[in-house]
């Protein structure tokens, strides 16, 4: 596959974290406006926000978010960050993207939860107008927060369902807070008909993935731990659950150490629906184009297979049938070569 063609082909991204995907140059602008000190040297700034190829573990990887979050505590900063992610998506040939973020992590300077969501949606929509990339938002509850606080995020997702929030996610420490910790929260989301995509099996165990599906998730973020529990693969196939795989990130965090361990082919051969994502464009120093090129190198991925992975993403996207139909036509048209 040729990188320039892969970049041009319309792609769908469903697993992209706002706070992990802001260009260092944009972050510098955001920080300077708030008088937040940061390294003058571009390389030093990059080292602050880009994780090394091999982190000691997931927590080591996540330290890159600490500085970024200190900069994302104003409406202006959040709007600029969201706009920046859409401009990157446009350069990457992304036709549709779902950008996720945790509102509870942006309240340090007194922003109210609805103000936070409004700021991000404003940036996304401005980006859509300027660059032609369709986008929606997903709200994350942080697993370490109080249940009551997470329930507020579920209600928030419901309140903004007409203006660009299309789903709910749980992110954070999966080992200490497995899915059944949140049975009531997820029951509320199901009751309010909020689509669920949950982080599960990034670390921890395959049972977390099965439990997340049982609790209503139609998509799973990562799901890598399923490789060690093949008994759950049939459940995901039967329920037509989409696995949002993020290759670069999964190696960086130490979720897998070698290519032989990476379960991409195992999942495909088991008949599971898989899609490819960046996770964190800046922290993982990647693009969706780079992710597909990695698969081409590792598995000799073909254009037909890339198209199928893109269609898997579209099928699992939290969009209306009409919106999917238009994007489907765009994908089919682009692959006529």
UniProtKB/Swiss-Prot annotation:
Its EC number is 3.5.4.4. The active site is at 202 (proton donor). CDD domains: ADA. SUPFAM superfamilies: Metallo-dependent hydrolases. Pfam families: A_deaminase. The record marks 222 as: Important for catalytic activity. Belongs to the metallo-dependent hydrolases superfamily. Adenosine and AMP deaminases family. Adenosine deaminase subfamily. This is Adenosine deaminase. Catalyzes the hydrolytic deamination of adenosine and 2-deoxyadenosine. Signal peptide: none annotated. Its cofactor is Zn(2+). Substrate binds at residues 17, 19, 172. It catalyses: adenosine + H2O + H(+) = inosine + NH4(+); 2'-deoxyadenosine + H2O + H(+) = 2'-deoxyinosine + NH4(+). Zn(2+) binds at residues 15, 17, 199, 279. GO terms for cellular component: cytosol. Binds 1 zinc ion per subunit. Keywords: Hydrolase, Metal-binding, Nucleotide metabolism, Zinc. The gene is add. One of its GO terms (biological process) is purine ribonucleoside monophosphate biosynthetic process. It comes from the Bacteria. One of its GO terms (molecular function) is adenosine deaminase activity. It is an enzyme of class 3 (hydrolase).
């Amino acid at each position: 596959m040729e990188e320039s063609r892969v970049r041009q082909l319309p792609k769908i991204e469903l697993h992209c974290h706002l706070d992990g995907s802001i260009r260092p140059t944009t972050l510098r602008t955001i920080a300077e406006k708030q008088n937040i000190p940061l390294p003058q040297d571009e390389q030093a700034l990059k080292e602050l926000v880009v994780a090394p190829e091999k982190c000691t573990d997931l927590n080591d990887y996540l330290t890159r978010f600490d500085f970024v979050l200190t900069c994302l505590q104003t409406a202006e900063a959040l709007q600029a960050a969201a706009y920046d992610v859409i401009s990157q998506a446009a350069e990457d040939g992304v036709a549709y993207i779902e950008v996720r973020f945790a509102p509870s992590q942006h309240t340090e300077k007194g922003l109210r939860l609805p103000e936070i969501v409004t700021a991000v949606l404003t940036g996304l929509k401005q980006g859509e107008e300027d660059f032609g990339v369709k986008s929606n938002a997903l709200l994350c509850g942080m697993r370490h927060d109080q249940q009551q606080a997470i329930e507020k995020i579920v209600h928030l997702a419901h309140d903004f369902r007409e203006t660009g929030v299309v789903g709910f996610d749980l992110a954070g420490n999966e080992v200490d807070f497995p899915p059944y910790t949140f049975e009531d929260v997820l029951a509320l989301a199901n009751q309010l008909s909020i689509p669920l995509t949950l982080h599960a099996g990034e670390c921890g165990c395959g049972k977390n993935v099965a439990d997340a599906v049982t609790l209503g998730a139609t998509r799973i973020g990562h799901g890598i731990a399923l490789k060690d529990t093949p008994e759950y693969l049939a459940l995901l196939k039967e329920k037509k659950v989409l696995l949002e795989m993020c290759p670069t990130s999964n190696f960086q965090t130490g979720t897998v150490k070698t290519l032989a361990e990476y379960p991409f082919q195992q999942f495909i051969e088991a008949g599971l629906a898989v899609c490819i994502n960046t996770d964190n464009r800046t922290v993982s120093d990647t693009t969706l184009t780079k992710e597909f090129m990695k698969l081409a190198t590792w598995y000799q991925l073909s254009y037909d297979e890339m198209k199928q992975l893109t269609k898997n993403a579209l099928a699992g996207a939290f969009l209306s049938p009409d919106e999917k139909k238009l994007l489907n036509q765009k994908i089919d048209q682009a692959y006529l070569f």
